[in-house]
Structure formats: C-alpha cells, structure tokens
Amino acid sequence: MKKIGVFGGTFDPIHIGHIYIAYEAYKILELDEVIFMPAGNPPHKKWKDITDEIIRYEMVKKAIEPYSFFSINNYEIEKKGLSFTYETLRYLHESFKEVELYFITGADCLVNLNSWKNINEIFKFSNLVVFNRPGFDKNDLLKRKEEFDREYCTNIVYLDLLNIEISSTLIRERVRESLEVKFFLPPGVVDIIDKYNLYRRE
C-alpha cells in the first residue's frame, strides 16, 4: 500500500525548516510522497493577517520544485469556507482510496489536539506524525502522546528532529526590517517575495 505524507500549513512564507521536516518524514517513515497542503482560510489564524492564498501556493510550488517526491494540492485553497483538518484528510482518503496517510504536524498541535474539530476522524483517516519544535519539552510531549494513544486507541508517531529555529514570523519580521532572508528560504521564494513586495512596511 502506498504511503503518503500530508504536510499542511499556512506557509507564509515556506522556508527551509519546512523542507527539512518534510524530507525527514519522507525518509524516516519511508513514504512514497509528501503532499504540501497550503491552508485556505485556516480556523486557527486571523485571515486578515495572511498573505493571499494564490501567492502562498506559488511560493510552495516553487520551493518544492527540485524534489520529485514532493507535490502540492490546492484542495484547501479551492474549498469555500473554513478548512478543517478532518475534512482535508477525508477528501484525500476518498480521492486516493488504497493509500495510508500520514498527517505531519508540529508539537504545538499535539498540545492543543483536544481543541481540534472531529479529532476521531483525523485518527480514522490518517496516522498522526508529530515533530518536535523549539520550546517544547520532549518528555512532556511523549507523555502527552501516550495519553492520546490510550484515549483514542491510536499510535501517534513522534519525530525527534533537529530543531531549526526558523519561523515564518521571523522571516516576515526580517523582511520588514530590510534584513537578509535568502539563506532561510528555498531557491526562488525570495524572488516571489520581491515580486509581490510581501511583508514590507506600508
């Protein structure tokens, strides 16, 4: 059975940390493919503060160009209304049929997992893969993982990855302050930021 990773996010902008996480998940879990799923109208974030979805899609598409095992899906962008994870996973499950899905997300999401809508469907349609993030204690995360495993009769995969302390927020702030960002971004993404004059002071 084909194994497909699903890596969702706002990607505003996508950076080398995202690429590293997706690659490590691909390698460690022996996935056949990782699908990047840029968020359309994410329920957990303020819509007015997010770059236009078409531009974010363009940045992700450019960033993953060199990798044959990465792809991009526009389901959440094309979908009208709020985008919830369980709906995305259900759509992919129904679209691909005979596949095993691995939903890749950060430690912050594990901490707040009980607030997610229809969490049982997330476990029904996918294997949850959680990677560590700066500021989160590994032992606390593993304890939380065990609690969710028992509560939902599942087996969350924990990836203990190298902490790359780069965030989209940091990059946006550096652009606003006219500081260099090209070393934090995949090739071509800086050009798109310049093309649309993103993140700069108005």
From Swiss-Prot:
CDD domains: NMNAT. One of its GO terms (molecular function) is ATP binding. Pathway: Cofactor biosynthesis; NAD(+) biosynthesis; deamido-NAD(+) from nicotinate D-ribonucleotide: step 1/1. It catalyses: nicotinate beta-D-ribonucleotide + ATP + H(+) = deamido-NAD(+) + diphosphate. Belongs to the NadD family. PANTHER family: NICOTINATE-NUCLEOTIDE ADENYLYLTRANSFERASE-RELATED (PTHR39321), PHOSPHOPANTETHEINE ADENYLYLTRANSFERASE (PTHR39321:SF3). This is Probable nicotinate-nucleotide adenylyltransferase. It comes from Clostridium perfringens (strain 13 / Type A). The lineage of its organism: Bacteria, Bacillati, Bacillota, Clostridia, Eubacteriales.
